[in-house]
């Protein structure tokens, strides 16, 4: 094989390695962002649930969740 052919193959291999490494980094960053989002969402939901339970406890009812940011209290929750 000529030197030009070897140089072209080496260049193609180098381009392939660099692009696959970048793709792996983007996938890892996407996964990390998804995990962070899930954690923040669960933390927010937990805080809202505690507030709802405290609010409904004063009325001696069960917290059924939040609707439009307001706690929904009932003796028994449906669905």
Swiss-Prot record:
<feature type="signal peptide">
    <location>
        <begin position="1"/>
        <end position="20"/>
    </location>
</feature>
<dbReference type="Pfam" id="PF02950">
    <property type="entry name" value="Conotoxin"/>
</dbReference>
<keyword id="KW-0964">Secreted</keyword>
<keyword id="KW-0027">Amidation</keyword>
<feature type="disulfide bond">
    <location>
        <begin position="52"/>
        <end position="64"/>
    </location>
</feature>
<feature type="propeptide">
    <location>
        <begin position="21"/>
        <end position="44"/>
    </location>
</feature>
<keyword id="KW-0165">Cleavage on pair of basic residues</keyword>
<dbReference type="GO" id="GO:0008200">
    <property type="term" value="F:ion channel inhibitor activity"/>
</dbReference>
<dbReference type="GO" id="GO:0005576">
    <property type="term" value="C:extracellular region"/>
</dbReference>
<feature type="modified residue" description="Leucine amide">
    <location>
        <position position="78"/>
    </location>
</feature>
<dbReference type="GO" id="GO:0090729">
    <property type="term" value="F:toxin activity"/>
</dbReference>
<keyword id="KW-0960">Knottin</keyword>
<keyword id="KW-0732">Signal</keyword>
<keyword id="KW-0528">Neurotoxin</keyword>
<keyword id="KW-0800">Toxin</keyword>
<keyword id="KW-1015">Disulfide bond</keyword>
<feature type="disulfide bond">
    <location>
        <begin position="63"/>
        <end position="77"/>
    </location>
</feature>
<protein>
    <recommendedName>
        <fullName>Conotoxin ArMSGL-0121</fullName>
    </recommendedName>
</protein>
<dbReference type="InterPro" id="IPR004214">
    <property type="entry name" value="Conotoxin"/>
</dbReference>
<comment type="similarity">
    <text>Belongs to the conotoxin O3 superfamily.</text>
</comment>
<feature type="disulfide bond">
    <location>
        <begin position="56"/>
        <end position="73"/>
    </location>
</feature>
